[in-house]
């Protein structure tokens, strides 16, 4: 709902879909652990794609890391050292990305990274700035789940509310963009 809270009626509808035999998989910019816990407590499919596609959680201690935290940390250190007001955002621990407060000019950071040949991607989810490995996005992460579970594009409905959801929309037959 924009405040980080779960809309209980929406969760109830997702649980009903799960009970009807559909896979309901959370794909988020938040940590995959947060999404996995939501799946457990919410009664949906216990698979989660987090960190904007960089991490897949399928069990309590089973994580597939698609991104490289070391490269993202190097990029953060460079940005922090050269641009004022760069701050880490207090979030649940990440395994593949760095999350920053939206307190600086993102385009300035992009230029700095290009000038220093650091191959990472910056994105703005409107919640935070994210530093991810190249090619890592929600669509890429979810496509790995599609391969694993033999899910066809025609069987995917994606729901999102951020520019970071566009890559997920591209792997789905049907997409719903919410106007939060």
Where are these regions (language model features)?
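Short active-site oxyanion
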Residues: 19-25, 44-46, 97, 154-156, ...
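Short loop or secondary-structure boundary microenvironments that flank
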Residues: 3-4, 28, 102, 135
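Active-site phosphate-binding/coordination module
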Residues: 4-92, 180
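Short, glycine/acidic-enriched loop or turn micro-motifs at the edges of active sites
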Residues: 1-4, 164
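Glycine-centered loop/turn positions within well-structured domains
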Residues: 54-55, 129, 176
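Conserved acidic, metal-coordinating active-site core of Asp-based
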Residues: 76-172, 180
């Amino acid at each position: 709902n924009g405040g980080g809270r779960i809309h209980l009626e929406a969760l109830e509808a997702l649980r009903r879909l799960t009970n009807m035999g559909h896979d309901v998989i959370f794909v988020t910019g938040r940590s995959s652990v947060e999404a996995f816990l939501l799946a457990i407590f919410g009664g949906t499919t216990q698979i989660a794609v987090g960190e904007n596609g960089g991490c897949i959680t399928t069990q309590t201690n089973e994580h597939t890391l698609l991104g490289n935290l070391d490269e993202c940390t190097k990029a953060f250190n460079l940005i922090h050292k050269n641009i004022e007001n760069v701050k880490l955002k207090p979030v649940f621990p990440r395994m593949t990305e760095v999350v920053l407060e939206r307190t600086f000019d993102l385009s300035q950071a992009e230029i700095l990274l290009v000038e220093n040949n650091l191959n990472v991607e910056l994105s703005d989810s409107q919640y935070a700035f994210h530093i991810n490995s190249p090619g890592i996005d929600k669509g890429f992460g979810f496509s790995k789940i599609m391969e694993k579970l033999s899910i066809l594009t025609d069987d995917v409905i994606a729901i999102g509310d951020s520019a970071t959801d566009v890559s997920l929309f591209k792997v789905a037959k049907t997409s719903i963009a919410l106007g939060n």
